[in-house]
Amino acid sequence: MFVLVNLKAYPCDPVEVATAAADVSDDSGVRVAVAPQAAQISAVAETGVETWAQHVSAVEHGSHTGSTLAEAAADAGAVGTLLNHSENRLKLADIDGALDAADRADLETIVCANNPAQIGAAAALDPDGVAVEPPELIGTGTPVSKADPDIVTGAVDAAARVNGDVDVLCGAGISTGEDLVSASDLGASGVLLASGVAKADDPRAALEDLVEPLL
């Protein structure tokens, strides 16, 4: 089970969260990664935690002011990237171009989508993984696996029909170990979460609670 913690732009200490994630991953054997702001990738990667970018742009080296170059993210220590999060949506051509950019930089990729139909379309672009996140549940503490489990099973089925090799994750409202188990029972191979860890008073305790049912 893969746990990817998206720090978004929350006012947390990214190194503190990353250190906690690295320790919990080492202690539990569960794969835990952290996706910080682009400027913090290097500092987070130095903790030893698996580090992801929140986004890379569909560009190569050149005149692209304000873009996030995939190669720069990789050089800073990222090993993967999210794409098309509901808070940073992309046009289809830009998703495809960003996947190409990530491939050039040898970054693992997860394309986010809102529902099973979009998951099928995302899987057709051949990322390493897709993640279904209903935007109305993001940050609510109500997990999609409980609010509407058919979204998760539908996403798993939609991806499998198009690309049997793609991993399917779910997100939105994930915050407890019970949520993680529910996602796994519905066929997801991992979860995305953010506020449940990034806004926690004790990120390590939050992560320990999250992975405890897997031990």
From Swiss-Prot:
Pathway: Carbohydrate biosynthesis; gluconeogenesis; Carbohydrate degradation; glycolysis; D-glyceraldehyde 3-phosphate from glycerone phosphate: step 1/1
Record InterPro entries: Aldolase_TIM, TIM_sf, Triosephosphate_isomerase, Triosephosphate_isomerase_arc, Triosephosphate_isomerase_AS
Catalytic activity: D-glyceraldehyde 3-phosphate = dihydroxyacetone phosphate
Entry's EC annotation: 5.3.1.1
UniProt keywords, alphabetically: Cytoplasm, Gluconeogenesis, Glycolysis, Isomerase
Any one Gene Ontology BP term: gluconeogenesis
GO MF term list: triose-phosphate isomerase activity
Residues annotated as transmembrane: none
Functional description taken from the UniProt entry: Involved in the gluconeogenesis. Catalyzes stereospecifically the conversion of dihydroxyacetone phosphate (DHAP) to D-glyceraldehyde-3-phosphate (G3P).
Record-given protein name: Triosephosphate isomerase
Species the sequence originates in: Haloarcula marismortui (strain ATCC 43049 / DSM 3752 / JCM 8966 / VKM B-1809) (Halobacterium marismortui)
Organism ancestry: Archaea, Methanobacteriati, Methanobacteriota, Stenosarchaea group, Halobacteria
